[in-house]
């Protein structure tokens, strides 16, 4: 009997008759080595299991090269690896694969790019399962968390081992959701690059997650875990937007929730005049009712689900900060009500932020307004978004809807912002009018200098007076010529000291 390929013959002495049996070797379990050659001449040696799929190999290369897997194409003996297992294409140990980058050409849907960018950034993270012990960012019995989030669109040098761009073996999703390290994501928003850094912190409010955006200037301190950089304050003195458009935040654990369709949000900076559309495919939370504090009147009607932006500050062109709150979707929570430690939770957090931006109205506040907002806000974050009466308010806010529609003294209302914009526009228009007037005067001076007759300003004034006073005079005076007959119309520009014969000559 010939030995079977891929197997080895082993005989057991205890078997009756000295029978031998075939035992499969561990060759199938051993990893196989692949040589990845790129079109630029770079070579990578990669070890993958024998049952590795094409999608898994592309994901490994995406994490190693920091390139979206949709932009990678693999060739094996002039055959493109599309889907399925590597063995189906004849790939074995020591096989050579060619890595070809995918070039986009033609028209593409602009709405699909941000969604792919978010998913590409999240899929490049490592998702090692965390230990069973709760992390420092775990709140007691709640699916809500507080985040310090740094958002800016300027290219910056990432530092520290927390950046997912540095790849590696660290479980980035687990470390972020357990509060051990911040998470940095590089997102493509149209023609811009947007960097988002999130830091998980404990929140005492049950079933609530609060996102606190810190200044981009404090990025280095935030990466070290300095919690004094962010200002985790709620916004009882600053309305987010109109009462009919702000989505609610349910503070009741028993409120039913249901998924909602995909919504798109925009980051808009009036100072930098840049708009960043974003769209993700994670369903934002939905709540059918809104709870308020005892003694307050119920809301007239339920509003659309989603997060609420409490404050928004523009620190520099392209650098934004603020706070917003929302509810984790039940699909992002485990049986104990804690957030699941996977990319779906992070995607839902980003979707809350991006969905809430289109409901926010008004110009980003300055740092001085942020200090005013901090004085009007309570010392500790409120567990819910129901406004509370402070010294900066003139009127009481009995409900959430009424509180958000009231005009606060800390933040300038929309009319004041529009007045400021109108004043700046008027200044620009007046300056343009002044420049045009100066240009007209210079052009008139050049035209008068090229004319055949040089009229003095006094003679021009005399002509205008004679033309205006042509009532009882002769018809010739009424014509308005206003010629001064005491002086000749034309004077020779010669020196009077010269003798007459030279003048005639």
Curated annotation (Swiss-Prot):
PANTHER family: MIDNOLIN. One of its GO terms (molecular function) is kinase binding. GO terms for biological process: negative regulation of glucokinase activity; negative regulation of insulin secretion; proteasomal ubiquitin-independent protein catabolic process. GO terms for cellular component: cytoplasm; cytosol; nucleolus; nucleus. Residues 238-262, 283-300 have a biased composition (Low complexity). It comes from Rattus norvegicus (Rat). InterPro entries: Midnolin, Ubiquitin-like_dom, Ubiquitin-like_domsf. Induction: Down-regulated at high glucose levels of 10 and 25 mmol/liter glucose with highest expression at low glucose levels of 3 mmol/liter. Residues 32-106 form the Ubiquitin-like domain. Keywords: Cytoplasm, Nucleus. This is Midnolin. It is found in: Nucleus; Cytoplasm, Cytosol; Nucleus, Nucleolus. SMART domains: UBQ (SM00213). Facilitates the ubiquitin-independent proteasomal degradation of stimulus-induced transcription factors such as FOSB, EGR1, NR4A1, and IRF4 to the proteasome for degradation. Promotes also the degradation of other substrates such as CBX4. Plays a role in inhibiting the activity of glucokinase GCK and both glucose-induced and basal insulin secretion. Pfam families: ubiquitin (PF00240). Residues 263-282 have a biased composition (Polar residues).
């Amino acid at each position: 009997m010939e030995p079977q390929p891929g197997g080895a013959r082993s005989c057991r002495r205890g078997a009756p008759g000295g029978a031998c049996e075939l035992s499969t070797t561990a060759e199938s379990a051993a990893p196989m080595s692949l040589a990845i050659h790129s079109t630029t001449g770079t070579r990578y040696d990669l070890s993958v299991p024998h049952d590795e799929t094409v999608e898994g190999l592309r994901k490994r290369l995406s994490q190693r090269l920091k390139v979206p897997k949709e932009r990678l194409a693999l060739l094996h003996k002039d055959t493109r690896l599309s889907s399925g297992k590597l063995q189906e294409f004849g790939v074995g140990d020591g096989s050579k694969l060619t890595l070809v980058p995918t070039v986009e050409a033609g028209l593409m849907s602009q709405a699909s790019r941000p969604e792919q960018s978010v998913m590409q950034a999240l899929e490049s993270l490592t998702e090692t399962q965390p230990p069973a012990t709760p992390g420092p960012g775990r709140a007691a019995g709640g699916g809500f968390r507080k985040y310090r989030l740094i958002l800016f669109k300027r290219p910056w040098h990432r530092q520290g081992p927390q950046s997912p761009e540095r790849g590696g073996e660290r479980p980035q999703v687990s470390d972020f959701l357990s509060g051990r390290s911040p998470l940095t994501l590089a997102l493509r928003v149209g023609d811009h690059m947007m960097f988002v850094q999130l830091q998980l912190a404990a929140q005492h409010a049950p079933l609530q997650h609060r996102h606190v955006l810190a200044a981009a200037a404090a990025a280095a301190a935030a990466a070290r875990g300095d919690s004094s950089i962010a200002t985790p304050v709620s916004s009882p003195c600053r309305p987010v937007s109109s009462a009919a458009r702000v989505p609610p935040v349910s503070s009741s654990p028993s409120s039913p929730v249901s998924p909602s369709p995909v919504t798109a949000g925009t980051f808009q900076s009036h100072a930098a005049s840049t708009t960043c559309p974003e769209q993700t495919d994670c369903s934002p939370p939905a709540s059918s009712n809104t709870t308020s504090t005892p003694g307050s009147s119920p809301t007239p009607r339920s509003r659309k689900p989603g997060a609420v932006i409490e404050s928004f500050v523009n620190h520099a062109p392209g650098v934004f900060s603020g706070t917003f709150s929302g509810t984790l979707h039940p699909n992002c929570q485990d049986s104990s009500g804690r957030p699941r430690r996977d990319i779906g939770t992070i995607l839902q957090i980003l979707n809350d932020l991006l969905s809430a931006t289109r409901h926010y109205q008004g110009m980003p506040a300055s740092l001085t307004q942020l200090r005013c907002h901090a004085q009007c806000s309570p010392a500790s974050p409120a567990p819910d978004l129901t406004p509370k009466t402070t010294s900066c308010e003139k009127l009481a806010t009995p409900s959430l809807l009424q509180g958000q529609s009231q005009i606060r003294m800390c933040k300038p209302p929309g009319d004041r912002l529009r007045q400021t914009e109108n004043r700046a526009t008027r200044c620009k228009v007046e300056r343009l009018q002044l420049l045009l007037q100066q240009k007209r005067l210079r052009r008139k001076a050049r035209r008068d200098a090229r004319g055949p007759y040089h009229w003095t300003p006094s003679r021009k004034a005399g002509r205008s007076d004679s033309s205006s006073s042509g009532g009882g005079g002769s018809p010739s005076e009424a014509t308005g010529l206003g010629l001064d007959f005491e002086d000749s119309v034309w004077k020779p520009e010669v020196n009077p000291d010269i003798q007459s014969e030279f003048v005639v000559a």
